[in-house]
Swiss-Prot record:
Superkingdom: Eukaryota
Disulfide partners: 257-311, 345-359, 353-370, 372-381
Notes concerning its domains: The cytoplasmic domain may be involved in the regulation of trafficking and proteolytic processing. Regulation of the proteolytic processing involves initial intracellular domain dimerization. ERBB receptor binding is elicited entirely by the EGF-like domain.
Pro residues composition bias: residue spans: 60-74, 651-665
UniProt domain EGF-like: residue ranges: 341-382
Signal peptide: none
Entry keywords, A to Z: Cell membrane, Disulfide bond, EGF-like domain, Glycoprotein, Growth factor, Immunoglobulin domain, Membrane, Secreted, Transmembrane, Transmembrane helix
SUBUNIT field: Interacts with ERBB3 and ERBB4.
Descriptive protein name: Pro-neuregulin-2, membrane-bound isoform
Tissue specificity field: Restricted to the cerebellum in the adult.
TM helices/strands, residue ranges: 406-426
Lineage of producing organism: Eukaryota, Metazoa, Chordata, Craniata, Vertebrata
Ig-like C2-type domain span: 237-332
Length: 850
């Protein structure tokens, strides 16, 4: 149906007879014109009839409601009045202020008859001017602008459009923000945006619509238009080469036609044997990738589908074609032997077989036969086979599923096994490292071998030798009442006296506020504590270890022999007097050395730490700092030049001693034999001014962790009394006799042998008694000389030094009982007064062998 957009004004003379399809505006304008002309006409009925006569509807226009027609006047006057009214109406059209408006409406009417294209791109490409604009207002037929927003959309009017966007290829010389007049035959809404496909007119800024405007709301029209209106975007289609396909009867096959280029998007058509193919039950035409390709698909290909196919692509710029073939192979069947004489049926007999069966004509018998597809059988493939005959075997699917499950479970098990192996390896490695760490710590805590034990000393940390208390250790030969428990006492040192060559040097001895209640080691017996501790470190606790080697057994036998010899001598000896090793808790005793060298777990010693805080201590360190031994410091050292030579015996000053010496007798013979060993040139007996050797008979080598040059030695001197006896007072004789009994010894580097200790004891006993068995004393002296000669080899040079000092040096020690300790002068007086009171009760030494 065609639609004509007409103006509200009367048409020009050439267009007389055209009418408007919109009668509401024309009728209203006719009524206004008739009412205006009724003032000059004869009657209103004649004017209405004239206006009605001017409104003639075409058959193509939709039916419009028309007013009831009045009967025409038959009189000539009425006819003349009607003619005048028509002339007045014609004169109103000629007075239109817009003379080009009729041209615009004529163009709009032509635009409405233009055929619509399928693609928006086609419309944009064919339209001379394409802009995006916004409707600002609608101009009614009277020429006044419509400002009412509630007015319904008007059609057949001129719209005032503001240009918002344009495309360079189709701009038509327009600029943005420019207002143009557009005549449209479709309803337009005010303040709405449209894409206008326009054609220019004779009037500037006046356009007519080539295609219906498109609303841009909710559509991607601008993008589609931009794809075709860009520079060098529009191209004719160009198709790719089509691939030929080969398939079996009943299979699904397809032919693909794809465009390599083409803008706007081309449309596709398929042809076979010059005939266009359309969609059917067996053939489908599909498009893909935004209609860039087309696919001709056969659901079940047949033998008759084989042939040549043509694909044609076309757009507004041109078209292109491509060709391809489809080959269909018949499936081999179990026909009889005469199948070699069969041929395909003609086109007229192909419909003999149904359900996709292929028809064959068997020559000789002139009979048609069908090759049925899977699932059908019979003469014409009418019967359908059971589903189980042509469907896949469910057992096969179950077998495949089972295999997949087995593979999955196997993979999981292998993964778990690998994880377990990794965990076990990590655990074993960690355990090995932990074991190595424990072994290392155990080696650091416990001695690994004998040398380390000797070097590191006791296993208890930071032990002060002064704090060793001999508790729970009962000697075999000493009664329980004779054991002494060491108590903590306050010890003071007095070092106010200075040393000089003519003055006797002595060292301060510790004094106790309760001397009658506690028995402590005097400094004269304990000042060589550091040396004994260092030598004790080198001694191993052989008594507590297992003895399996021959050397160990031999050493134990020797110690047992020495022990028996000492026991026999002690049994025949007179009452005990003080000697070097007489005190049970002396640093020179076997118990003390054994306590230092025995591990803490086997030692019968209780350790107490009561060292005064004001007395600094020092440590004997070893490579293993955990076994360092802390020792108390020595007293301040002040000694003479002559005392710097360690373990050298100096002759006593010539002249009478303070008391009578040992008279002729067995004791004197033993003394002479003792002195004759060390001083062969001195004569048969000890001369005046000679010094007895005392208790220092030799020492073991120094500890490998102690530098002997750093030790501060102290010399012990014992001056033998003059041979001629003199009558003295009782107290003086006691003081004099106490002299040879109190052997002086230096700081030892090792432990004296048993035989040397026995010799010293026997000498002390014989000299204290004054008259004993001469034969026994001589034998003991000979044994002692042998022992001394065996253990004094490190000091063979003592004789020369003694002779030189005896001949050239002045007397360095008095005849009285004195010891050259470094800074105490009150020691000799205290010692003499103590000995004058009488010998203390003898405390037997430990009879157990080392």
């Amino acid at each position: 149906m065609r639609q004509v957009c007409c103006s509200a004004l009367p048409p020009p003379p050439l267009e007389k007879g055209r009418c408007s399809s919109y009668s509401d505006s024309s009728s209203s304008s006719s009524e206004r014109s008739s009412s205006s002309s009724s003032s000059s006409s004869e009657s209103g009925s004649s004017s209405r009839s004239s206006s009605n006569n001017s409104s003639i509807s075409r058959p193509a226009a939709p039916p419009e409601p028309r007013p009831q027609q009045q009967p025409q006047p038959r009189s000539p006057a009425a006819r003349r009045a009607a003619a005048r009214s028509r002339a007045a109406a014609a004169g109103g059209m000629r007075r239109d202020p817009a003379p080009g408006f009729s041209m615009l409406l004529f163009g709009v009417s032509l635009a409405c008859y233009s055929p619509s294209l399928k693609s928006v791109q086609d419309q944009a490409y064919k339209a001379p001017v394409v802009v995006e604009g916004k409707v600002q207002g609608l101009v009614p037929a009277g020429g006044s602008s419509s400002n009412s927003t509630r007015e319904p959309p008007a059609s057949g009017r001129v719209a005032l459009v503001k240009v918002l966007d344009k495309w360079p290829l189709r701009s038509g010389g327009l600029q943005r923000e420019q207002v143009i007049s557009v005549g449209s035959c479709v309803p337009l809404e005010r303040n709405q945006r449209y894409i206008f496909f326009l054609e220019p007119t004779e009037q500037p800024l006046v356009f007519k619509t080539a295609f219906a405007p498109l609303d841009t709301n909710g559509k991607n029209l601008k993008k589609e238009v931009g794809k075709i209106l860009c520079t060098d975007c529009a191209t004719r289609p160009k198709l790719k080469k089509m691939k030929s396909q080969t398939g079996q009867v009943g299979e699904k096959q397809s032919l693909k036609c794809e465009a390599a280029a083409g803008n706007p998007q081309p449309s596709y058509r398929w042809f076979k044997d010059g005939k266009e193919l359309n969609r059917s039950r067996d053939i489908r035409i599909k498009y893909g990738n935004g209609r860039k390709n087309s696919r001709l698909q056969f659901n079940k290909v047949k033998v008759e589908d084989a042939g040549e196919y043509v694909c044609e692509a076309e757009n507004i710029l041109g078209k292109d074609t491509v060709r391809g073939r489809l080959y269909v192979n018949s499936v081999s069947t179990t026909l009889s032997s005469w199948s070699g004489h069969a041929r395909k049926c003609n086109e007229t007999a192909k419909s003999y077989c149904v359900n996709g069966g292929v028809c064959y004509y068997i020559e000789g018998i002139n009979q048609l036969s069908c090759k049925c597809p899977n699932g059908f059988f019979g003469q014409r493939c009418l019967e359908k086979l059971p589903l189980r005959l042509y469907m896949p075997d469910p057992k096969q699917k179950a077998e495949e599923l089972y295999q997949k499950r087995v593979l999955t479970i196997t993979g999981i098990c292998v993964a778990l096994l690998v994880v377990g192996i990794v965990c076990v390896v990590a655990y074993c490695k960690t355990k090995k490292q932990r074991k190595q760490m424990h072994n290392h710590l155990r080696q650091n805590m416990c001695p690994a071998h004998q040398n380390r034990s000797l070097a590191n000393g006791p296993s208890h940390p930071r032990l002060d030798p002064e704090e060793i208390q001999m508790a729970d250790y009962i000697s075999k030969n000493v009664p329980a009442t004779d054991h002494v428990i060491r108590r903590e006492t306050e010890t003071t040192f007095s070092g106010s006296h200075s040393c000089s060559p003519s003055h006797h040097c002595s060292t301060a001895t510790p004094t106790s506020s309760h001397r009658h209640e506690s028995h402590t080691w005097s400094l004269e017996r304990s000042e060589s504590l550091t040396s004994d501790s260092q030598s004790g470190i080198m001694l191993s606790s052989v008594g507590t270890s297992k003895c399996n080697s021959p050397a160990c057994v031999e050493a134990r036998a020797r110690r047992a022999a020495a022990y028996n010899l000492e026991e026999r001598r002690r049994a025949t000896a007179p009452p005990y007097h003080d000697s070097v090793d007489s005190l049970r808790d002396s640093p020179h005793s076997e118990r003390y050395v054994s306590a230092l060298t025995t591990p803490a777990r086997l030692s019968p010693v209780d350790f107490h730490y009561s060292l005064a805080t004001q007395v600094p201590t020092f440590e004997i360190t070893s490579p293993n700092s955990a076994h360092a031994v802390s020792l108390p410091p020595a007293a301040p050292i002040s000694y003479r030049l002559a005392e710097q030579q360690p373990l050298l015996r100096h002759p006593a000053p010539p002249g009478p001693g303070p008391g009578p010496g040992p008279g002729p007798g067995p004791g004197a013979d033993m003394q002479r034999s003792y002195d004759s060993y060390y001083y062969p040139a001195a004569g048969p007996g000890p001369r005046r001014g000679t010094c007895a050797l005392g208790g220092s008979l030799g020492s073991l080598p120094a500890s490998p962790f102690r530098i002997p040059e750093d030790d501060e030695y102290e010399t012990t001197q014992e001056c033998a009394p003059p041979p001629p006896p003199r009558p003295r007072a009782r107290g003086a004789s006691r003081r004099t006799s106490a002299g040879p009994r109190r052997w002086r010894r230096s700081r030892l580097n090792g432990l004296a042998a048993q035989r040397a200790r026995a010799a010293r004891d026997s000498l002390s006993l014989s000299s204290g008694s004054g008259g004993g068995s001469a034969s026994a004393s001589d034998d003991d002296a000979d044994d002692a000389d042998g022992a001394l000669a065996a253990e004094s080899t490190p000091f063979l040079g003592l004789r020369g030094a003694h002779d030189a000092l005896r001949s050239d040096s002045p007397p360095l020690c008095p005849a009285a009982d004195s010891r050259t300790y470094y800074s105490l002068d009150s020691h000799s007086t205290r010692a003499s007064s103590r000995h004058s009171r009488g010998p203390p009760p003898r405390a037997k030494q430990d009879s157990a062998p080392l």
